Amino acid sequence: MKNIMILSGAGLSAPSGLKTFRDNDGLWEEYDVMEVCSATGFRKNPKKVLDFYDARRAQLQNVKPNHAHEKIAQLKEKWGKNLFVITQNVDDLLERAGCKDVVHLHGFLPELRCLKCEGIFNIGYEKFTDKQCPKCKSKDLRHNIVMFEEQAPAYATLYSLLHQTSLFISIGTSGAVLPVGQYASMCEKSILNIYEKDVNLERYFDKIYIEDIISAIDKIALDIENFMKDGNV
């Protein structure tokens, strides 16, 4: 059986009410992105960065998975190991929708990482304050998020899975961070979902949905069915 990859970005979680640093309102407007999302910013003012991620966890607690998260979870349940679910998002909305084995390329907001033993543990939506590593009891901790100027270890998993992928589906990402057009070119067939037209990106894909993911996801699910039957989308 052929393999499918769904790679998602901020456009997947935006309908749930989660803002990104590309939005001009909400949580991000109060911060300079490079001060709170870069390795340099963390070295200069770790408290400011950790407070920022506390605020993001609090925001995450107040939103819910949307129809697209739930549909992807259903697709993963149906296709199992033949569907790779990869996301640039750091939220837990796919998991809360019931999706298994999600690969988070840029880290996971509910988790902290121990700088002493490198252990990773989940704190849910709680604040960073007074936490200690359950493994080594160290309080030398940080958010488990890949910041600007840092390497993303999960990219190795992404590229390994891409070489096993026949149908590549890009959802809600502009290609500004990852070269999704290049990824599409590596696979037999490809589907793009974006909210606004982008001719430079669209030229790499076989099928394009320029619309909200909520309205596109059921069509994409049908495309997957067709691809698994006869190799077309």
UniProtKB/Swiss-Prot annotation:
Annotated Gene Ontology cellular component terms: cytoplasm
Active-site residues, Swiss-Prot/TrEMBL: H106 (proton acceptor)
Enzyme class: transferase
Superkingdom of the organism of origin: Bacteria
Keywords associated with the record: Cytoplasm, Metal-binding, NAD, Transferase, Zinc
Compartment annotation: Cytoplasm
HAMAP family noted in UniProt: Sirtuin_ClassIII
Name the UniProt record assigns to this protein: NAD-dependent protein deacylase
Organism from which the protein derives: Campylobacter jejuni subsp. jejuni serotype O:2 (strain ATCC 700819 / NCTC 11168)
Lineage: Bacteria, Pseudomonadati, Campylobacterota, Epsilonproteobacteria, Campylobacterales
Gene encoding the protein: cobB
